[in-house]
């Protein structure tokens, strides 16, 4: 038997939406000296950490003065921000990773640092160079359907009768699928008072200001035009030349900008080899 829940029921839930990855993160924090949580801006990284790890102090590298102190006076920075410490947007001052390495190497404690950031590839590279073997890495994406509808069942699929019977206890009929697809999966959009068009307008402005200005030399209007062109091609085969023609820049520039969208968690390219593998399995 299934239970039908509409989005009205979703909006009435408590402001914080329980994330399925939480038990994994708690386990990793308890067994690792340092944990890194990556994911695009506003998927809920900071909210999750602040809600689930309340004993951690917090430093946010979106703040310029905080970054400056971490870079120029790391000893004073750690004196002002003792462990356990959560450092948000750590990729903005990656030099601190060397200081973190020194601290964790001098201690046997677990759960000393939680780091988060929205530039996945830069962080992975920095971790492999500075904190290899000392950090556990997890990725947070947007809300899943189970998270949106408050389904507590959170086990990976196993083709057994026992799994099916347990899963049937919480079967939910998802209403308004197309509305959810159109709206997206950012947690803030599931606040009943949030206008999604205004939200995405602000999101793009923040993304251009905080991330793109640091990664690419392009004016905001041209890059916004590029974002629009890419969004219109969601689910299609990627044609760099076609996008370059629409935006009015070179094909190499488009390739570079696509890689930036991937690095910041905005797009997820699927390689043609994956598509071919799926076709082979289907055959």
Protein language model regions, located:
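Conserved small/polar residues in nucleotide/adenosyl-binding loops
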Residues: 6-14, 273-280
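Hydrophobic anchor at the beta1->P-loop junction of P-loop NTPases
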Residues: 37
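Interdomain hinge/linker elements that couple catalytic modules in large macromolecular machines
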Residues: 150-276
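Short regulatory helix/loop adjacent to the ATP-binding pocket of P-loop NTPases
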Residues: 122-135
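Conserved lysine of the Walker
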Residues: 45
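Hydrophobic positions on the alpha1 helix immediately C-terminal to the Walker A/P-loop
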Residues: 48
